């Protein structure tokens, strides 16, 4: 689709062919209803739907009343894109018949023509005329011509040395980096706002909506051109991740940590893909956009993940393999509902189904809670589950450079004497931690809202 068209246009540009990119003004809202009903005549199966949606004028609500719309496709309609493409297809077909040596690249309302300048001087006016027959008007001032100033002058269209077509840069390589920098800047507000969300929401949003923002650009631009972009994009991602996990950015930026973060969830990572790691694979797979290309990317990605695992310390690899009960702790903040106890929560992707060794099926976050109370994982006694949580806290503190003492300690809070499990030795004062295994860790409570779990814990 879009990616293939971009590669074809860039290849034509490199070969010195002239390129004309046409801009259709407000295309979806100007397509004639007559053209839409011709679609119904050509494809009878679509007639009931088109009759239902377009037989009568559409009501457009406005602050001053209702506007009756009698042109264009319905905004947001599931069939609107299909109807638009089928209605505009005759214009493209007519142009191709008159100028068979001209290549027409059309994705929705984004239409580009490539070929010999002389033939384009004939084909472009034909295309403009044919599109006008279905209600589409071409704005010559916003259209562009690449590789041929003479053709641009003849058509009355601006000549440029590069342009954004289908969301990618086509033209002078020297300006590609500038284009990618602009795309990077557009992502900054998203990452900044994502970091302010609640952590259990922020991490899935970051991995599913933030990280993929680089995919299209990586797949449609040469790795040499995206190298700087990928590095800066990864740094932006890591900055947001550090804010979400509430850890110093310097710790997140360590190469060892970046590799762990990059690994997929199934391998114990966070699934926060590093753009710099996958850029070459992504571009090659896009250029070879077929089954073979997809398999190649899958194979190379698998090989990369194995290489990353092989480069990590054995202790860390062993920890990553604890898929049943390992979770990434994002905070260790006192919770007033727990009598100022530390509330541990784990990040999770709610639709990722995991299976415990006891056979319990659950989502990742709930499984982490279930595993703490699962006798199959930790044994029948409470002490082994207690040890698992205690060990997690100790490892978390050690990784963050906090001095600890895991010898049983006695703490007096001014009211009573308490026996605690861990003492955190901080510059200002010591912090005492006591680990309690409660029903909140059991699978029967794992799916309940946090407020319910807090209420049950407080009562206990």
Q: Which stretches of residues belong to each language-model region?
A:
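Short, conserved micro-motifs composed of acidic
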Residues: 118-125, 129, 137-162
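Basic, alpha-helical interaction scaffolds
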Residues: 157-225, 286-293
């Amino acid at each position: 689709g879009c990616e293939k068209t971009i590669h074809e246009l860039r290849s034509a540009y490199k070969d010195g062919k002239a390129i004309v990119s046409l801009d259709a003004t407000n295309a979806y809202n100007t397509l004639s209803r007559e053209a839409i009903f011709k679609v119904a005549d050509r494809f009878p199966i679509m007639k009931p739907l088109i009759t239902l949606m377009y037989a009568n004028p559409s009501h457009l609500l406005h602050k001053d009343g209702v506007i009756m719309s009698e042109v264009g496709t319905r905004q947001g309609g599931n069939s609107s894109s299909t109807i638009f493409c089928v209605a505009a297809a005759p214009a493209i077909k007519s142009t191709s018949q008159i100028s068979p040596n001209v290549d027409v690249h059309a994705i929705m309302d984004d239409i580009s023509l490539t070929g010999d300048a002389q033939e384009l001087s004939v084909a472009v006016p034909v295309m403009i005329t044919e599109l006008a027959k279905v209600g589409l008007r071409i704005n010559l001032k916003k259209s562009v011509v690449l590789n041929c100033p003479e053709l641009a002058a003849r058509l009355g269209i601006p000549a440029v040395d590069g342009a954004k077509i289908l969301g990618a840069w086509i033209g002078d390589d020297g300006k590609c980096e500038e284009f990618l920098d602009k795309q990077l800047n557009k992502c900054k507000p998203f990452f900044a706002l994502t970091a302010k969300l609640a952590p259990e929401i922020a991490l899935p949003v970051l991995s599913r909506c933030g990280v993929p923002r680089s995919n299209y650009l990586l797949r449609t631009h040469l790795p040499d051109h995206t190298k700087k972009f990928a590095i800066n994009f990864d740094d932006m991602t890591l900055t947001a991740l550090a804010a979400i996990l509430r850890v110093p950015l310097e710790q997140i930026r360590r190469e060892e940590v970046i590799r762990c973060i990059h690994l997929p969830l199934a391998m114990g990572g966070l699934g926060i893909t590093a753009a710099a790691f996958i850029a070459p694979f992504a571009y090659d797979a896009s250029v070879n956009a077929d089954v073979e290309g997809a398999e190649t990317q899958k194979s190379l990605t698998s090989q990369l993940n194995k290489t990353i695992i092989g480069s990590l310390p054995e202790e860390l690899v062993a920890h990553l393999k604890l898929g049943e009960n390992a979770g990434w702790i994002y905070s260790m903040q006192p919770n007033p509902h727990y009598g100022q106890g530390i509330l541990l929560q784990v990040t999770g992707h709610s639709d990722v189904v995991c299976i415990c060794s006891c056979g319990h099926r659950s989502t990742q976050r709930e499984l982490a809670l279930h595993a703490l109370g699962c006798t199959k994982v930790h044994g029948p006694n409470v002490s082994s589950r207690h040890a698992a949580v205690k060990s997690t806290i100790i490892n978390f503190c050690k990784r963050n450079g906090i001095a600890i003492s895991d010898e049983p300690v006695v703490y007096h809070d001014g009211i009573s004497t308490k026996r605690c499990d861990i003492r955190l030795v901080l510059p200002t004062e010591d912090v005492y931690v006591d680990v309690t295994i409660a029903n909140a860790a059991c699978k029967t409570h794992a799916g309940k809202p946090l407020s319910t779990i807090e209420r049950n814990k407080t009562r206990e």
